[in-house]
């Protein structure tokens, strides 16, 4: 099975939308391809999009440098366990390094043990902190 990781293309829109809905149940993607602060990544196998990852560029105003947040990492169920997620994470790291990013950051629910294993395998370190968020809009 050959997995190719590449930059998202507008032709991937429908496939990514289906994948996001299956993974997160309520999300619907909008077109952000013209926004320079976002970099979308897909994994492809035999012409089918089987993985998606979103990188968001964020400026740290204290250090006057940027970092990247990784969001919406998802892999089609039948392709899990074949290294798709790891390949996308490696691509994201290479991209962020190439663009001068200070670090990569992501959040993950504590119940997603398999995802935690992937992130730790890719060199991410679980930090001793809690995230607080207040929803302003309910979906």
State where each predicted segment sits:
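Conserved acetyl-CoA-binding loop-helix of GNAT-fold acetyltransferases
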Residues: 75, 81-94, 117, 121
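Conserved acetyl-CoA-binding loop of GNAT-fold acetyltransferases
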Residues: 120-129
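A conserved beta-turn-beta hairpin within the catalytic core of GNAT-like acetyltransferases
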Residues: 58-70, 80, 127-128
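A short beta-loop-alpha structural element at the N-terminal edge
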Residues: 2-16
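Conserved GNAT acetyl-CoA-binding A-motif
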Residues: 89, 96-108
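Active-site rim helix/loop that mediates acceptor-substrate recognition in acyltransferases
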Residues: 24-40
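Conserved beta-strand in the GNAT
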Residues: 42, 48-57, 69, 74
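Conserved beta-strand-loop-alpha-helix junction that forms the acyl-donor binding cleft
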Residues: 105-115, 133, 137
């Amino acid at each position: 099975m050959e997995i190719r990781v590449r930059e998202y293309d507008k032709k991937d829109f429908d496939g990514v939308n289906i994948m996001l809905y299956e993974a997160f149940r309520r999300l619907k993607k909008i077109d952000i391809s013209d926004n320079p602060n976002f970099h979308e990544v897909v994994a492809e196998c035999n012409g089918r999009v089987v993985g998606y990852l979103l990188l968001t560029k964020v400026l740290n105003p204290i250090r006057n440098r940027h970092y990247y947040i990784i969001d919406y990492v998802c892999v089609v169920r039948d392709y899990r366990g074949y290294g798709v997620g790891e390949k996308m994470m490696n691509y994201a790291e290479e991209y962020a390094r190439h663009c001068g990013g200070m670090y990569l950051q992501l959040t993950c629910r504590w119940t997603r043990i398999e995802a935690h294993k992937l992130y730790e395998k890719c060199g991410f370190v679980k930090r001793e902190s809690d995230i607080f968020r207040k929803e302003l809009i309910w979906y």
